[in-house]
Amino acid sequence: LYTKDSKRLSRETLALFDTLVYDIADVGCRYYTFLTTLRYCIEDCAAAGKRLVVLDRPNPLGDRVEGGIVRPDVISFVGGYEMPVCYGLTCGELAEMMNRELHCGCDLHIVPCAGLTRSMTFRDWGHCWVMPSMGIPRFETALLYPGTCLIEGTNCSEGRGTGDPFGIIGAPFIQAEAFCKAFNALGCPGLEATPVYFTPTASKHQGVLCGGIQLHILNETVLEPVAMGVRLLDLLRRMYPKDFAFLPPVREDGKIFLSLLAGHRDFEKPDWDADALLARYAEE
């Protein structure tokens, strides 16, 4: 499903089986592309007359719902369905919803989780965290990811190539102490930052000394990661207007990657307002 030429099931692959079993751990966040892969599996199996069995898994973020709804004009691999960033469903529930609302007609079967309650998070499972990918090494990473993944659409490092991906944010032009003080002054619930200097071993700014912050979760029950991510973008553009930038368009239609992540094009407007944007998210 992650080959270079296509992310869909090919005719040749579909001809190899009668039933496809989907057994993939997710992180409860729309950017994490396993959910788009699930949509493709539903659509491709429906078109080919194949059965799809989803082994349901609990959502590590529980019933957390946050962020705006993806607009139809920015549907992409990081936003493959019109839903919020944190969606509060299990993969089985999401599969049923997509199959129904997209009118796929897939022969879909869900093997449910035993003993699951809606409010459960990973803390309630009684298991060790198993990395769903190298970028999400800890549960704490999954908690921050809905907010700090927005940094992937900018010229700042989101911490890839460090020991704390999505927990360390920075760039060569950032003065760590001043930026940390300004971030903490925002009063993001459940969070505190400390200044950090780091040199990424991979991805953006590889081999270059960066200043920035490391995020520490003090109270995950009041955490608002998407709101934190929006305020982080706003702080970066205000403190470093000459250096901070969104990455250039990645598609022929001119849409920037940040718009695909966010699920809307508001960030492309020079006068976007963080408070107004977060108020709209809450309404949606």
Tell where the protein language model's regions lie, with residue ranges:
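Glycine-rich oxoanion-binding loops at beta->alpha junctions
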Residues: 1-16, 29
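Short acidic catalytic loops
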Residues: 19-27, 53-56
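Glycine/threonine-rich flexible loop motifs
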Residues: 26-38
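A short helix->loop->beta-strand "cap" motif at the edges of active sites that frequently abuts
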Residues: 45-51
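Glycine-rich, charge-decorated loop segments at or immediately adjacent to ligand/cofactor-binding or catalytic sites
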Residues: 53-75
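Conserved anion/nucleotide-ligand pocket segment
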Residues: 75-148
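Glycine-rich, aromatic-lined ligand/substrate-binding cores of catalytic
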Residues: 116-196, 200
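Conserved functional hotspot residues or short segments at active or partner-binding sites
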Residues: 170-281
